[in-house]
């Protein structure tokens, strides 16, 4: 490997570490899902993403849906996709450094068939909720926290997940969580 590539690899690896900010360990994080602009079944896919992170956290925190926007720590909205699939703004408390709220936006539309659409909504919600709980981007394309950087990344990523499914009912189940062992390790390390 040329020396310049090694330096670039080290810089990328350093840039893809876990944030120091996270929610208080043991907390219940209330999540409100905005019905405005939500695709059919979109709220159910976000709930599956919440359950996936809750299971991976292994009692370090719990995500729970709430009907009350004002008391939610995380608020999820849907938007018409531009060049992004989603985005998140997480806010830490200035005194404690702990996360106290986050705004998550997930694309309500996607190219492809109905299954592709469900996959994009679920995996985007999973990725963006990962940011909302304190995780940064990863350089490993096997991770849900992977940052698309190359042409074709999104097709490879979503297509790879689709190949693991037997049916749409597998989305967000133990058979197809969308998390890699590294995602789980990073999460648990952040909340130790």
Per-region residue spans from a language model:
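Extracellular (secreted or membrane-anchored) zinc-dependent metallopeptidases
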Residues: 141-192
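Disordered inhibitory propeptide/activation segment of secreted metzincin zinc metalloprotease zymogens
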Residues: 2-42, 50-51, 81-96, 179-182, ...
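Metzincin-family zinc-dependent endopeptidase catalytic domain
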Residues: 43-143, 149-153
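Second-shell loop/turn segments in exported
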Residues: 32-43, 109-120, 170-177
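Short, intrinsically disordered low-complexity segments
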Residues: 1-2, 64, 148, 174
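Acidic/histidine-rich, surface-exposed loop or edge segments in extracytoplasmic proteins
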Residues: 24-38, 102-109, 163-170
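Residue-level signal for functionally critical sites in structured catalytic/ligand-binding pockets
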Residues: 2, 14, 54, 103-107, ...
């Amino acid at each position: 490997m040329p020396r310049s590539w090694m330096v670039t690899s080290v810089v990328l690896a350093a840039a893809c570490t876990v944030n120091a900010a996270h929610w208080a360990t043991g907390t219940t994080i209330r999540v409100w899902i905005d019905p405005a602009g939500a695709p059919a079944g979109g709220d159910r896919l976000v709930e599956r993403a919440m359950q996936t992170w809750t299971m991976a956290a292994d009692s370090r925190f719990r995500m729970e849906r709430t009907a009350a926007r004002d008391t939610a720590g995380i608020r999820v909205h849907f938007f018409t996709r531009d060049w992004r699939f989603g985005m998140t703004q997480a806010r830490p408390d200035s005194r404690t450094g702990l996360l106290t709220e986050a705004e998550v936006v997930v694309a309500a539309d996607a190219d492809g068939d109905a299954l592709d659409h469900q996959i994009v909504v679920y995996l985007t919600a999973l990725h963006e909720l990962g940011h909302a709980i304190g995780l940064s981007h990863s350089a490993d394309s096997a991770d849900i926290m992977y940052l698309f950087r190359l042409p074709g990344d999104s097709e490879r990523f979503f297509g790879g997940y689709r190949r693991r499914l037997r049916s749409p009912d597998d989305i967000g189940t133990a058979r197809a969580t969308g998390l890699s062992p590294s995602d789980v390790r990073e999460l648990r390390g952040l909340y130790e």
